[in-house]
Amino acid sequence: MGGLPEGHAYFDQLVSEQTGAIVVDADYRVAPENVFPAAIDDADATIKWLQENAEERWGADPTLMTTSGFSAGGNLAFAVTQQKGCQAPSPTAIKAITTFYAVIDFRLSPWEKPHPDNMPKNDPAKVFLPLFDAYAAPARAKHFEDPRLSPVLSEKESLPERILLVVPGIDILVAEQTEFAERINNEDGEREVQRVEILHEKDLFHGYLEVPDIVVKRDIKHRAYKKAIQVLKETHRKYDWTWNA
């Protein structure tokens, strides 16, 4: 299971500098050595520790926590909301989620997921598909309806008021993310700001934020970062926190 923290230091820096947030980028046990629920157990333990210790350790407000993640890390950013202490009306409820090409439906193996028309016919990552399924496959039958494994199943009441999905168009994860957004927003009905927003980068691919700038220019990557930081700032202001760098 990927979505590893080492690749996201630049985004972490932007969030810290532009929002004033205390940013904690956590690691977790990975597959194939550690399958579900190892990673989400580690993420849950991290959130619980932060709720109990972040204020004393760093002066951070445990009642204004948001989560974020890339790829498999996006799965965990969603799945931690299934803890009661991360849901309203708990004061420590997660206030927003921002994810980038998040894996939110493990009910299907990667090769079973719908492939967009613009996916390359000879996918260079095809050889790795069994590895991509190593986290979920051993637990799939038993946990088929478990939102800790497949957050696409989350009830809207368990989710925060603001969610951003950055969805590149050249990716097998497009359908699960767009269908999730449509379901939650339809269940919400009319709102001033939709709960789930999508930034759809139709000509980009899974992992594009983590490749060198010579492959994907930094200004293109910054469209996703800028939108995520906007959502975080708006969430902070809603709860009376503003940052003047």
Stretch-by-stretch model annotation:
Residues M1-A245:
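Alpha/beta-hydrolase superfamily serine-hydrolase fold, recognizing
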